[in-house]
Regions:
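Cysteine endopeptidase catalytic domains of the caspase/legumain-like
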Residues: 2-283
Length: 283
């Protein structure tokens, strides 16, 4: 091989090496772009999951119990109320977990689901429609599978309203809203009491608002409408433009008290530190 041929061979090898290097760089850059795109997609997916499951700022647990085997007739209004209230709250930005005709296990699971999602930015609402009984100066929501013959059965078979409120507080909820429509004559108390005692006063933890369908110790009738007296009036007030929770609850109390001429006086207890608006645009 002469000198000229050797020089050409060297230039050819150098050119090939440069070409291989360029191709390698292109492949590497393409792979890096793909990895960045994959990482971005993962981040978006994580944000979506976190936003819908872990970081929702408004949560509601709505329980409507209507079909109690021990009752003479179903509480159809409780089911209607739970459905209508769930629909209204969803329109107002709440992520609603609705449970109908819940057993004790169903109610405990629902409370635990709620517990797992509460954080310090969360406004939490609990609604219960059904039968409620007080025992030991504490109010209990009764599941449809409750078997009650004595007062101790209430504590064992029921779900404590104060217990759910305590859970909300321990989880650090920003605000706690509770609506209890359970001051009805029930088929259980006559087995161990001479008359129905209604519900006990519900303790109000910090930054909480509680609406109950009757005064402590009182029972009320449901009326004959599609919804209970309490929920029918509450739905009207929730839909008012710019309604705050405290305003809606108080207007509900006043309207029912006046319409019934004092026969039914709902109770509102508040320790709220700021206004909570049902319409998100209102605050």
């Amino acid at each position: 091989m002469n000198v000229r041929q050797l020089d050409i061979s060297r230039r050819t090898i150098a050119l090939a090496a440069a070409l291989i290097g360029t191709v390698s760089l292109a492949i590497g850059a393409h792979a890096a772009l793909n990895m960045r795109a994959l990482d971005a997609a993962k981040a978006v997916a994580t944000d979506q999951i976190t936003g819908s499951v872990g970081q929702t700022s408004r949560l509601a647990l709505v329980i409507g119990n209507g079909h109690y085997p021990d009752a003479n007739a179903p509480l159809t209004q409780s089911i209607n109320d739970a459905r209508a209230l769930s629909s209204s709250l969803r329109k107002k930005g709440f992520d609603v977990d609705m449970v109908e005709d819940a057993s004790k296990d169903d109610m405990i699971r629902a409370v635990n689901r709620l517990k797992s999602r509460i954080n310090r930015d969360t406004t939490v609402m609990l609604f219960f429609g059904g039968y409620g009984v007080q025992a030991g100066r504490e109010s209990y929501m009764l599941p449809v599978d409750a078997v009650i013959w004595k007062e101790s059965d209430v504590r064992r078979q029921g779900v404590s309203i104060e217990g759910v409120l305590d859970m909300m507080k321990q989880q650090g909820a920003k605000a706690k809203l509770v609506v209890v429509d359970a001051s009805r004559r029930n088929p259980y108390e006559r087995r161990f009491r001479s008359y129905s005692h209604g519900l006990a006063p519900i303790g109000t933890p910090d930054n909480a608002l509680i609406l109950s369908s009757a005064s402590p110790g009182k029972v009320v009738d449901d009326g004959k409408g599609e919804h209970s007296t309490l929920v029918a009036e509450l739905l009207n007030n929730l839909n008012a433009q710019g309604a705050s929770a405290e305003s809606a609850f108080n207007k509900t109390r006043i309207a029912i008290s006046r319409a019934s001429e004092g026969d039914q006086v709902p109770t509102v207890s508040s320790s709220l530190l700021e206004d909570i608006h049902f319409n998100e645009a209102g605050g």
